[in-house]
Amino acid sequence: MKKTVSRLLALALTAALVLTGCGGGGASEGESGSTGSSAEAAEGEITDLYIPRLLTRELETFNILYSQRQEDSENLTNLIDGLLEATPEGTLEPGIAEEWGSEDGGKTWTFKLREGVKWVDVNGNEKADCTAHDFASGMEWILNFYKNDSANTSMPLEMLEGANEYYEYTKTLSEEEALALTAEEGSPFSEMVGVDVPDDYTITYTCITEKPYFDTLAVYQCLYPISQAMVDELGGPDAVQAMNNENMWYNGPYTMTSYIQGNEKV
């Protein structure tokens, strides 16, 4: 991955976010779908992102599934890609998903994912493919009481078949039992919740009733992915809650190579 060295000098009242491009962003129209992780940056390609910000609140978490704070979202959505993106005008554009739609009035939504998207570490080293299983793992995390502690649960609880039942089920377990749950085939999540992964690059969400606007919600953090392989590498859910820019995995256009609370993000 092409990297450029970025530096940020924090001023007394102004901070800035400089994120190093990792070349793994969404493919534009006409591209093959490859992330181009080994290719040189094209002429004119943005490799550094600079966002001036007043020094207010800092990041509380690097787990995009856990937070609904604007400060966290502004940073983390540049590091992690979800299914879809929205323009300032509200138009939906492909993210990890390159095709999506419903054939039954919005009761069931299917998203076809782009192949070749990689999870990478802070140095741009490839760790794993980003697949539909990661989006299922993300939803399991959201609906697991002990993993998520009620953050970002309202939309899936109200919309997805079996979501509320699974959330209540996890509350009946011990913390140790609940933290050990995954979204793997044959798991309680896969049996109870309306999230199906028929292959590595297809994920289907089944709603309680017809939701013709469900795709507009696919930009929200509650539908973001998490790699179970990363969870395992870090040592489990507790370690994910405590992860930082140095040990998290990225699948978006930028990595955060340096983070100093209240001072610097590079």
Pin down the residues of each PLM region.
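Short, well-ordered beta-strand elements
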Residues: 46-57, 108-112, 135-138, 203-205, ...
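Extracytoplasmic/secreted proteins, especially bacterial periplasmic and envelope-associated proteins
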Residues: 74-78, 82, 91, 95, ...
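Short, low-complexity disordered leader/linker segments with a strong preference
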Residues: 1-50, 62, 91, 133
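N-terminal lobe/hinge region of extracytoplasmic solute-binding protein
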Residues: 52-104, 249-255
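Short, solvent-exposed loop/turn elements at domain surfaces
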Residues: 45, 58-67, 91-93, 119-121, ...
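Aromatic- and charge-enriched surface segment that lines or borders ligand/interaction sites
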Residues: 98-162, 204
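Gly/Pro-rich hinge or "lid" segments in bacterial periplasmic/extracellular proteins
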Residues: 176-182, 189-193, 200, 206-266
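Solvent-exposed coil/turn segments that connect beta secondary-structure elements
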Residues: 56-59, 88-89, 105-106, 114-116, ...
